[in-house]
Amino acid sequence: MEIYIEQLKNQDAEDLFNFELTNKSFFETMVPSRGSNYYVYEYFQKQLAELLKEQTEGISYFHLIRNTEKEIVGRINLVDVDKEKRIGSLGYRVGEKFTKKGVAASSVKLILAQARVYEINEIHAMTTTNNIASQIVLEKSGFSREKEAETTTVDLNGGNVNFVHYIWRTTKD
């Protein structure tokens, strides 16, 4: 599937809200819930305003993943950016009907290229031990598996899962 990424903007609010609402149950099989308030549009708009403020300040960079029909197929973000150390953390999610089409791998490749523009040289990522697909995407994208977090566990669908930590570092041209 051909995709591109673009920076999140306020005008994306309604489409993004619908994307999140449509994929709520699917996402919650892999990551902890965002809470019921997140799916109330007025609350969502406030959260979006906070994200856009972070983006303006250069603390985080939020992107939508879109297909050639301009439909939102996922999100990919660089957050907790430390400009002095040139470090950030990666997060992404792909909508249920767009999985197994190479969207995650393609969008990670695109965000790593964008990281150079943002002057980020090291990116940390975490995924749960049960999310094998995400582990494969990260490893094939040049991330190194660092360790399984011993103290970072979450309750997911009635069971505890640990996080696996990854790091990507830019190579000098």
Predicted regions and their residues:
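Acyl-donor (CoA/ACP) binding surface of acyl/acetyltransferases
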Residues: E2, Q7-D15, F19-F26, F62-D173
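Conserved GNAT-fold acetyl-CoA-binding loop/helix
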Residues: E28-A49
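A short helix-loop-beta-strand connector motif used in the catalytic cores of GNAT acetyltransferases and
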Residues: S36-N37, A49-H63
